[in-house]
């Protein structure tokens, strides 16, 4: 193939845009030295001894453990702590290139060792990231979590997941860039370490092959939003091949490098290789061209690199890079200096080469010198930290700042100097602010220094300089790192109570410790003189954040000096946040009553005497110790000994790990010795006194109590550009209130008069129903000169008694984003980050104050009293009301008529830069981001400018537009939709963008900055951008787009209108044009700008997805799916929490398997995946499916931190504990002598996936931490794993004790909850998870269909990685196929030998599998399950895993095991089919859960005994009709896909029974079975179905369970469609399903989906059901509920009494009535949506 490149000859200008450097302007040796040292401050992992500073320590030592790897090492990216391998490997390559080109400079300056150290350090890390040929880990750390915390690297506590690319989920750009780094490193390290260089080279070759074979970045997703590979991967393929050629001299690589040149980035709309952008982490083609030019001497490459360097120097093709007034070549606001200095390096390297034209050598060199000198300070200030004149002192860098308080403002200075760091650089006008929050101009990064180092090496060769001899960054601490503050709470004649706070503000380096303790010294002379012993002192604590107080201990007996030991061992204290770096204890020391205590002679009393109660001072007389080493304070004298006492020794027990299966007794592992720690007491905080000012005139809070306000502060920094008060309004009265009568006032100081904007990001009542008004007070008062008035539209509805509005998320800001100071604001309570009553946020009904206290001195609103009627005071007129509300423009403005010729402008006054931010052609939102450039010579008033974006509307609808953010102010941007008089190619509409006068003047050579625009149709139906005139799909970065036209005074001055459009007038070079005025623009939105905040990142808010469209061509049932899908995703419905986790139900008072509605289950997550798979089928949008899987993986699959599974013996997987019929037989004793079998899966899975971690969902999660256990037992974080069922098949949900999966003995009794379930001599801290196999199988089933449908659409590549995850989940799901203790099938004696492998496999999907282990990783265990219910089987998933090439698991036996399981499952159904056709219960391999002998005559299935209710028995598991519908739907799908005859026969009989029992009533209602009654048993299975004449079923109760109705209909539809494919069409089954769908839809729709009334007679068990607790056992729930013998269900769940539905339930119980509720269960809504889509897919509009 012949490839033609188009090059345009450059134009050389005569004026140099830069200031020439003076020879030897700076000490380049010192600059080079420090620029290299910068990388020492970025090092992650265990630091080597050659590091030259004392403030960096080991960090991120667990990186990679989530995948069973050591991924420690490398560099942190910037001022954060994520390891992004794309910019990191680019940096590694650039440093090696510097050493390759300018080795002499490094040798002469003494810096060669230091740069080679860094090259070796980073490439060693890359080797770790490449554990096998086609696996590469490209990122460690989560950008969102990392950026949400501000603190030093050494004490990070957040999860740091690792992300990989593979053959099926590739990332060619990052893999090839890493190959380049390793190849380049192999060259420069060859002399120093030839063995390591050879290793690097081999990895480079393998990685290059990986990148080249895959040629895709589809798997490179985790870095999106941070380091997207915008330029693609072909530039990296060339770049890496060049370095491999240089390393190997193998011409094959040179050929490869040249072959990809044709694919390098092009100038938009042309075939010209891009020459404008800089060589950087994303785009390395300019560097590749330079090296290819030097290697080949070909003109092609010379011209590429010279056009680039010409553009950056004298100009090329009439264009030149922008220069600042002081001479910086300025490319972009982000890292302007990194681009300029890297281009300088390329200029140096190319000008050094003999092939560079003589006339250009000096030009390029002088350019390079000027840019480096600019960075070093030629303008009067240095941009390199720690170098030169006026250098940056406050870079945006967490570890250098070293905050202990998770705050950019604490401390107010940087504790460390980040020597050598090149900051981002100035704006285009040379402006620069040295501020920690200025991450645009003042952040640093590895890639910023990457080209800078090489350029400095060249400057050193040119001009010399003297590195500082033996330079090290050894610092003297600027503050006390550890100290104690103390004060007196109270004192009396015989006691003193001390309030003490231990502080860890360490920074040299920062360190976390859980071994702090202090000594409080006392003189006991008075006590001893009175005849008492020191041991008669009494010690007690009040508020305690984790200390153990003991003593007294002798210090100096001759002087009667003793000390009290306050030991925080076990409590982690680290410089990572307000509640992390300090811990408080309040302890009392009391002598006997008649002893007169004299505090004045106590050594530790010296500094605290006279301190007012509640206050503290720093005191050196209370010494502090870290692991017995004194780190603070002074001890009294030296006459005594100072041992660190051990008051009591805890013996080392033998651990007894326990599992948490659902629902079954807890299994245990072989014990390993583990220390049992003393649990940390739960703190009881003291309340903060509230000061109530006396106002004048008096404003009295309401006493009528109609409403009150709950407040949560979501911005804890006092200095901030955004205030975030989140609110809930509570109706505390007895009658409903119309919310449109209610207003709320938030009082604050504006701190600089500006226009302001407010918005509700999300509100349960609907954000669009919330209004805002800013009101300026007539005169300022203490704490306020403004208030924000929050009101409600009529759509907010009525607020019922005892209810609240739900969360209302509010934020407001000044339009110029300047800061507020909240510190003195009346309504702000810094510490109230969770909801509580705030009386300083006032509430009004009809303008009358009914809640709270207005600030003193305001003219108060009227107040409400029980007797007086008050006339409301009118609200003052607000000074600013910029509330953003999107306003649609349904009626288009006609196109103005003018001259019928459209000629591109030649006047050149302005041009438009465009970036496309929506690359999908089919979308419901168009996102053109723009910049307007003044390319003329005089300023332009932007109010005269309009822009037109031309497109096709694709279905006439009202439309809305908004600017989310604009540098000129989003409120200054206007919009108007204009319909063309007749359609033309590419357009029937244009969006006209205009500017208000506030946008100001646009100066010559300047641009407006970014204007972020999006528009949509008001019904959110789709556009098809594919044929739109203005849309350029590939232009995702800014470039000139002449199809976006621009006008001044209505005259076309830029771009080309579509052919045939009635054009605007145009400007030509000579005639004078009378412009046609454009009608005044009609704004369609008054937007609120939302740039990144300057202090802290925006917190996560409730998910607010873009409303989905109804795709064109859908019939009635597809439209139903879309309607319900939107209801489920509408935040106002309440199906998800703010993290995107689906609740079990919208309603909270509900008790089923989860005992609270806002828990969730793996079942809900599996339905979530299924719902979004169907959404992808109907819309072609697979992003929602991916989000569902990502959320599932993030929250429901335990992470590496959640499951430290490091020590597991598959030959002894667990210790036996029997199951018992009823809870009162528990705890179950461990029996160590009972044999258990071998686990045959473990080694195979570890070998396949390289990890000991399990990949399956735990079944139960406390989404919002309702119980209070927290994630991994921290007590506070939401989304925590919990468990309930533990004690045999008779333990109903009403008899469970909810407990944490992460057991640290913090709650429950002394052994946590373990000794309720397992009897042992000793108990150890441990974790336990339980998998519900039917849920994992459903997620796999759904993913199979997603795969099929995505392939039909040609979009399989979008979800291929998720199909791989489903296959992996299926690999691990095989544990459900094995007996609990791996006993052979038919085992009827617990003492019989265990299985030796697959002889323990029953191949069915059992009730659960479970795994667990010690918190410290010392031991682990796994179990299967002996009990299998037909309702858990999933032949559809089994078939996919056994037969589908994309779904087959990777392990050697995975697919074959699933093939056996598929056959066994179908036999299981046939064995259990009753004479009538319904399916009976299941089978067990462990009779009574203890491997007892089967009763005589029991039917068997492959040696397993028939069990009517093989799972739970209260109520009997197979009395519930739901299992029939759920399970047979999967059989029907399997039949539809395969035509399997056994499945068809099974279904034919089952469907016949269904038709006979479903009721379609004449009044339009329906009923399906709800409760079944069983008799008899099946015949023993011999491979043939006998008809089971002795197994019978009766329907004993009916209902309208909507979710099960949907699942039943789904089964009927797939069966019917299968009969149409493979036999005689059962249209009756289809019609029955359709009738059920139609009746359900007609009868039960509501505002949140579909719901039917449910009578809940079982709810009396809230009050009556005793939860069995053994006599004498006592403990506590996290909220303080006492657990003891005799407690009822509600006694240990007292928080239910706060539920809004509790009064209704309680009233019904007291009156003897059966309460009735409506529920919106997440799984049921999904089932209903899915079945409607199933009808659409299978039968269309029939």
Curated annotation (Swiss-Prot):
Organism field: Caldicellulosiruptor saccharolyticus (Caldocellum saccharolyticum)
Protein name stated in the entry: Endoglucanase A
UniProt GO molecular function: cellulase activity; cellulose binding
Enzyme nomenclature, EC number: 3.2.1.4
Biased composition (Low complexity): 636-651, 858-872
Gene3D superfamilies hit by this protein: 1.50.10.10, Endo-1,4-beta-glucanase f. Domain 2, Endo-1,4-beta-glucanase f. Domain 3, Endoglucanase-like
Cleaved signal peptide residues: 1-23
Top-level taxon in the UniProt lineage: Bacteria
Pfam families in alphabetical order: CBM_3 (PF00942), Glyco_hydro_48 (PF02011), Glyco_hydro_9 (PF00759)
